[in-house]
Design a protein with these regions (language model features):
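Hydrophobic alpha-helical bundle signature of multipass membrane enzymes
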Residues: 33-266, 336-406
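Extracellular, surface-exposed repeat/solenoid domains
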Residues: 508-574
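Alpha-helical transmembrane segments that form the membrane-embedded catalytic/substrate-binding core
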Residues: 231-235, 266-295
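Extracellular beta-strand/loop-rich repeat segments of large surface/secreted proteins
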Residues: 441, 472-538
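C-terminal segment of classical bacterial N-terminal signal peptides
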Residues: 20-30
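Charged, amphipathic alpha-helical linkers/stalks
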Residues: 284-368
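Bacterial N-terminal signal peptides that target proteins for export
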Residues: 2-16
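Extracellular repeat-rich scaffold modules on cell surfaces
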Residues: 408-479
Length: 574
């Protein structure tokens, strides 16, 4: 039954915030000061993960269909066939046109293949050097490998082959992807027919349709609507599911998912806002499936299958990896979160973390607690105010690429306990975000954590056990550094400790030219280890304002070399 569009808009305005928002380059500095900040916010439909199975025909209101409810932010701009914000909608189509007009030959081919292939097959390239093993051991296949030089017939079919086999060696992984991306509840057909927003190529002749698809797109039915993008939804459902099972490729896979969305704009199929909406639906649907009690055994089987010789132990170094560059991935992913839209709504809304969203990080940050993963999502979320993204629960503002880099801010004492015996990210991980906040980082456990950001958090660092690598000059932030056990490794020259340094035990590892700069007092003890490097008489290993104590043990010094303590430095002498 089709519902009245005006009635839908009225319900939306009552049930959800419809403010629109924008994205700065820097990670939002919002901090969860108490656990109350991390509590989920209930939408008109309840919580997405609890009611995702209601995304079916006949459920067409924000109250009885979580996808319709999540996407109801679009009613700020369009409903009942009328534009409510012509400027945003005009920008939406203008951006779509510009993107199609600047389409390169390689982008044309890629977007064509994205269009024709099974939606799930599209994400295999995100596996990079593991794609060869996946194709072999999942019996993955496609019947589209090149783009034709002439337009396809209007009735040309999509892929007819099974994308991968659920009875293959990687069957559990294939089944989990199918459960997420091909369930009766994962589609966008219902919400599209509620919103009824016309495709961009039918709104403006400036949107240049991909020539190979011109006949197909011209013949599409009139109710083949734009918002949200179904391909993008499926891309994030598939990409995030694969990322759960293969967290070693987390950021690469979600970057490919975002690229699939971009491919839809390149082909002229979808507008940027539709792609942004598709990311939201795909993210929420994946979290719902991964949280569903019925899928827990399959979820574990998929992870285990991926971590065998069938996939992660069969790396193909000769295979191409389109997602090997971290900075390129980061720039691409984060730009596609907002597609250049500026904030146009309430920019002062606190971050919201949806119920169950933390499951998306469970395998990527396995050493954190459930609440800590929610805190990561909170401190890496987008600011409010961007078009479409301010849904009631907070799915639109999740920045999972940044979240995979660990905390964005420390608002309290955060203890990270890593067990190296469990392997993977439990054994070693790197936080790349620029940490802010007034909280303290406490490193415990046997694993190794690397801090690689330009950090400004003021609560200091305490190392109790394991290894903490300072991989940027400002990795330790602005507070005191206390070394009570484990290994503190300085890997960058001229690393600065902005507070005091206090070593009671453990091992401080420096290079001959590290020149650790301690801004205030240093209290020395424990072991100093010098790594191999060029030795020069009189080199400053560290400087400080004042010093008490000396190292109890010094290792790594070649024969004939010594350390010399002065009022403000520790020197290498011969």
């Amino acid at each position: 039954m089709k519902m009245n569009q005006h009635s839908w808009l009225q319900r939306v305005l009552i049930s959800v915030s419809v403010a629109v928002v924008t994205l700065p380059i820097a990670i939002q500095g919002a901090q969860a000061k108490t656990t109350d900040n991390l509590m989920p916010h209930e939408a008109a439909y309840g919580y997405f993960i609890d009611h995702y199975r209601q995304n079916v025909t006949g459920h067409t209101t924000p109250q009885n269909n979580p996808v319709v409810g999540e996407m109801s932010t679009f009613s700020t701009y369009w409903s009942n066939g009328q534009a409510h914000d012509p400027d945003i909608l005009s920008q939406n189509i203008s951006q779509a046109a510009t993107i199609t007009q600047q389409r390169t030959d390689s982008e044309a081919t890629r977007s064509y293949l994205t269009d024709r292939r099974d939606l799930r097959y599209n994400l295999i390239s995100g596996l990079g050097p593991y794609a060869t093993a996946f194709i072999k051991n999942a019996n993955a296949q496609t019947d589209f490998t090149t783009m034709p030089t002439t337009p396809l017939p209007a009735n040309a079919p999509y892929s007819k082959v099974e994308w991968a086999s659920p009875t293959s060696t990687l069957g559990p992984l294939v089944k989990l992807v199918n459960t997420t991306a091909r369930s009766p509840f994962s589609g966008t057909g219902v919400v599209k027919h509620v919103v009824k927003y016309v495709r961009p190529y039918r709104q403006s002749p400036q949107v240049r349709v991909l020539p190979a698809l011109s006949n197909v797109m011209a013949a599409a039915k009139g109710d083949d609507y734009d918002f949200p993008s179904g391909h993008t939804t499926a891309a994030f459902e598939t990409g995030l599911t694969l990322a759960y099972a293969v967290p070693e490729r987390f950021q690469e896979l979600i970057t490919r998912a975002s690229e699939v969305g971009y491919d839809r704009v390149l082909a002229g199929r979808h507008s940027p806002l539709a792609v942004m909406g598709g990311r939201m639906v795909g993210t929420a649907m994946t979290a719902a499936v991964l949280n569903d009690p019925e899928n827990q055994e399959l979820k574990q089987q998929a992870y285990q299958a991926a971590h065998t010789n069938a996939l992660l132990n069969s790396k193909d170094l000769s295979a191409s990896d389109n997602f090997s560059d971290y900075q390129t991935n980061r720039t691409a992913y984060r730009s596609r979160l907002t597609y250049g839209f500026k904030p146009s709504g309430d920019t002062h809304q606190a971050m919201r973390v949806p119920k169950g969203a933390e499951v998306l990080l469970a395998s990527r940050l396995p050493y954190l607690s459930t609440n800590q993963r929610r805190d990561v999502l909170y401190t890496t979320g987008l600011p409010s105010g961007y078009p479409v993204l301010d849904d009631a629960e907070g799915w639109g503002r999740l920045d999972l690429f940044s979240a995979a880099n660990g905390y964005g801010a420390l608002s309290h004492r955060v203890t990270v306990t890593m067990n190296a015996n469990q392997g993977g990210f439990n054994a070693q991980d790197t936080w790349r975000n620029n940490l802010t906040g007034h909280g303290q980082l406490v490193k415990a456990g046997t694993g190794a954590l690397t801090l690689a950001g330009n950090n400004h958090f003021t609560g200091g660092v305490q190392l109790k056990a394991g290894t903490l690598n300072l991989a940027s000059p400002t990795a330790a932030g602005k507070g005191n550094v206390v070394l009570n056990g484990g290994t503190l490794r300085v890997t960058k020259n001229h690393t600065q400790l902005s507070g005091q340094f206090h070593q009671t035990a453990g091992r401080l590892v420096v290079t001959p030219d590290s020149h650790l700069r301690i801004k205030h007092a240093a209290k020395l003890g424990g072991t100093l280890t010098l790594t191999k490097g060029h030795l020069k008489n009189g080199t400053k290993l560290m400087t400080f304002q004042t010093r008490t104590g000396k190292f109890k043990h010094i290792t790594g010094l070649p024969h004939g070399w010594h350390v010399h303590y002065t009022k403000h430095a520790v020197l290498l002498t011969k």
